[in-house]
Amino acid sequence: MQYRTFGEDTKLQFSGHETFPLRYGWLKKAYDAVKNNVKDPAAVFSADEGIRSFGVGKNMVASIRFWALSIGIIAPIAKTPSAYEVTDLGKLILDENGGDPWMEDPASLWLAHWKLASTADRNSTWYWVFNHCPHVTFDPVSYTHLTLPTTPYV
């Protein structure tokens, strides 16, 4: 029996956060930057503009973009993949009148976790670990030498 974990058209991604964990305020900063930069949406995360507007180095700018895309706060514009727009989820949570602009409610954090763990193409590691690994604990040995169960489970 073949054990399928990803669809045929899934594009796996195992990097992009530049080794930076998601930090408090990053999603709001990314949301506001994309929302307020409608004249040139491709410039928001460019090296010069990103460093200036976010006040961080270029690797952190890339990480902020990664986390905002991974959680679904922003999305690439269809015809211009290097340009971004805010999503309905981003508006619902992070807008001035949104439900939790600073992501302080535990429910918002759980939603972010669910988005990370449920999207295989951008968040392949989280998807794999939280959906296909039966381990009760997380330790380096278990995941360094990861093997699939002999039979699929639901």
Where are these regions (language model features)?
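A short acidic, leucine-rich amphipathic alpha-helix
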Residues: 50, 139-146
